[in-house]
């Protein structure tokens, strides 16, 4: 809701991982990014950090190695995102008490911003880059951009039913694909 005010409180920083190998990472190693980001956050704040791995990737040796490394950092916690587990916590529940989220280009940043939770976007490919902090150093005073302008902008990235029915959408896509 663009009219929902930005939150100014919260209990922790929610660091949201992305699916390993996801194209939106542009070749970046999500494990290295997560470890580096935890260490960078810790340089700027002592707030509790909760790491939320992507729900479609878990229980690998690399995942467990990362978990071991980051949990050695003071007040860092790991929240599994396995829907089948009895202690599963939804992203909506986690956003309720989050000070802010930190994302690379994850769609979770969209959920955060829509719900008034500030976000730190670590890549220009993030859909919430315009309404997010872009520097971890701002974590204690995250940017809270104009959500109304942002929602208008992203709404114009979609096609209407009429544009599908008229063929305008296909003509546009076809031109991009085939010249």
Indicate where each model-derived feature is located.
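A donor-sugar binding/catalytic signature common to diverse glycosyltransferases
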Residues: 86-133
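Short, solvent-exposed loop/turn segments at secondary-structure junctions
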Residues: 18-22, 55-58, 84, 107-109, ...
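Catalytic donor nucleotide-activated moiety binding site of glycosyltransferases and closely related
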Residues: 38-86
